[in-house]
Amino acid sequence: MSLIEKLPDLNAVKGGFGERLAAYYSKTVFSDAYVLHDVLIDGKDEHKSQIDLIIIAASGIYVVEVKTFSDAKIYGDGRKRDWQYYLGGHRYDFYNPIMQNKKHVEYLKKMLSDFAKVEFYSVVLMLCDGCKVSNVNRSDRVDTVVCTSLPAMNRAMKMFLEANETKLSPADTRKIYDYIKENQEQGKEARRAHKEDVKAYRQKVQTERENRVCPYCKKPLVLRHGQYGNFYGCSGYPKCRYTEK
């Protein structure tokens, strides 16, 4: 059984938590930030993206994915499609939230393509009993963080704030906020269609797992023999270096 099948919808689990989180961070991290919660946007590729939290500040746009796993330990690799969730002596696989939020950022960038010089940051907040994650960023540029507590999230956002020399004007942050708010998908029908889309996408991911397909370039994975044992690697190597056990 996959974690996706075991757990209820995360939006239902969180309830009003996301709104409280948004209010908290709009006041304590960025005094001049605009905050949007539970935003549904059109990716222009027949898919939509539901974003838990968007913080629009002078230092850039922070796209936040919140995962709530009570009494569980999580292990993941930023380069791997599947992460592991351990609870009650059992292991469950679930889709890499770094990859998930990367898609959110990609869709939001498309939506805001008319706004130049905007920095985007991916923040994954894992509320769980323990979390060990490796290879969060795939290059020397750090634009993604995985946090396991609200204070850690606070520190990460401050790190981005201090490191970014490009600043948006108050007028620009307001324009971006208004644009997202006015152009987000709204209404029950849009939400229903998105749920059906997510269901189909999860089935697609499961099929790719079973058929050993690379999540990045969609080429077949092939069995390889390494120094530390056998593993599956992308047939597109060396252009694509995805591997899995």
Model-derived segments and spans:
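Surface-exposed interaction regions that form or flank ligand-binding interfaces
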Residues: M1-Q50, I56-I61, K67-S70, Y75, ...
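TOPRIM-like Mg2+-dependent DNA-processing core and adjacent phosphate-binding/basic surface
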Residues: R79-R81
